[in-house]
Amino acid sequence: MEEKKISEQESLELITRMINQTKKDLSVGNGDSFLMWGYLSAAISLAVIVMLLATNDPRYAWLYMVIPIAGFTVSGIKTYKAKRKSHVASTYASNTLNNVWAIISAVFAAYAISCLLHFGEVRSWNGMFLLGMLLPGIGTYTTGVILKEKSIQMCGLLGVVIGTGLLRDFVCGEQVISIMQMGHMVLSFVITLIIPGHILNFKAKKQQ
């Protein structure tokens, strides 16, 4: 009986160590990734809004393509360098998080390719706005759950709530993305990426 109690205690300690190791491994790196994607997405989105207001030329919407091109390039370089430097085995939780964000990235990429293959269907690109508001929120919420950070969970949920507003517009048959909806997307990037990034880095510095 005593042996069972010790086993349970060791199991709890192991789980706690794994969670703490995951937080230590992911906090700074993941925080920087959140910030890179968040500031890049928000800056490009604001640039598109300004140019559309100034010129009324919809071709400036192509600036949005800078986000995935620059974002995935920087992320790929950082991941490659991190793998070369790190000799610590990844935890199950960190692998799970990486897989979640990999799936989200794959969905974005697959939808973008589909839009390019049906280039003449302009309305299909509106779906990128919906994905850009919903999926980061889901990924951020999942990150918060795995890291047991309620503040990050709340940021993810708020992002999803903002995204559901755009989903309602699509269901009601709205065909054109408005400047206000673009502004909502900027707000979504701030809530789901920038704020969680600063939270993760702040928590990491406190643990050092």
Which residues does each PLM region occupy?
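N-terminal juxtamembrane cytosolic/stromal segments of multi-pass membrane proteins
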Residues: 1-31
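C-terminal ends of transmembrane helices
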Residues: 21, 76-92, 138-147, 194-201
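Selected alpha-helical membrane-embedding segments in polytopic membrane proteins
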Residues: 26-113
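Membrane-embedded alpha-helical transmembrane segments of multi-pass integral membrane proteins
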Residues: 40, 44-47, 70-74, 136-139, ...
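Helix-coil boundary and interhelical linker segments in multi-pass alpha-helical membrane proteins
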Residues: 49-60, 113-126, 169-179
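Structural signature of hydrophobic alpha-helical transmembrane segments
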Residues: 61-70, 120-134, 183-187
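Membrane-proximal helix-loop-helix units in multi-pass membrane proteins
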Residues: 96-156
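Terminal transmembrane helical module of multi-pass membrane proteins
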Residues: 139-208
